[in-house]
Amino acid sequence: MSNILTKIIAWKVEEIAERLLHVSQAELVARCADLPTPRGFAGALQATIAHGDPAVIAEIKKASPSKGVLREDFRPAEIAISYELGGASCLSVLTDVHFFKGHDDYLSQARDACTLPVLRKDFTIDPYQVYEARVLGADCILLIVAALDDAQLVDLSGLALQLGMDVLVEVHDIDELERAIQISAPLIGINNRNLSTFNVSLETTLTMKGLVPRDRLLVSESGILTSADVQRLRAAGVNAFLVGEAFMRATEPGESLREMFFIT
């Protein structure tokens, strides 16, 4: 596990312990029983691709550990509306407070403002967070293979699917991909960022693409900054993308999305 990921996971352990003092897991479980059915996250991506278009997971992210604050004028609801108008299939919302300046409320605000399915982008290591994600309104959760052992991957993905959510399983190298394939989640995200060096290369996706089973949907994540990047990945048969930084730095995030993915 990389140094930054080790720090984040250590913080998450403390965060979960603190949250348990205020809301028990039993209370979250009870709340889950009365919630409406999640919006289909994987289904939305697959429907877009079946229509012949690129499926974009547009990210709502105020800051990152490597780049600092990306967007000072940060209004999740307005960004969500902009993304939906720009052609996004789904949203990703950072809820990590300490490292990404996110907040649980950002997810709720974004989801309430549009009709798109929403990924809770956080560092999920415990069943408590899966129930919490469902209560917040998440339609999908992220599981980072580098942060979890095989038993955790199976248990957390199984719980999310049982609660009606989808799971995006994120990998950074071939060893992690082989582990991700062993669980039944339909979405595999290949992160082009090296967690040790923070260097980004689209070659990560291009090299590993052929190893992803045909019954899984590959999502390329990180380092997609221009329409040329999109064209390069599309030419290689990549049809689903998670993009955040490029949009967050734009004056109009949804227009940036449209220009990058839908104007040739």
Swiss-Prot record:
Transmembrane residue ranges: none
EC number(s) per entry: 4.1.1.48
Gene3D superfamilies: Aldolase class I
GO biological process: L-tryptophan biosynthetic process
Record-level Gene Ontology MF annotations: indole-3-glycerol-phosphate synthase activity; phosphoribosylanthranilate isomerase activity
Keyword Ligase in annotation: no
Catalysis performed (reactions): 1-(2-carboxyphenylamino)-1-deoxy-D-ribulose 5-phosphate + H(+) = (1S,2R)-1-C-(indol-3-yl)glycerol 3-phosphate + CO2 + H2O
Entry-linked NCBIfam families: PRK00278.1-2 (NF001370), PRK00278.1-6 (NF001373), PRK00278.2-4 (NF001377)
Protein name: Indole-3-glycerol phosphate synthase
Organism: Xylella fastidiosa (strain 9a5c)
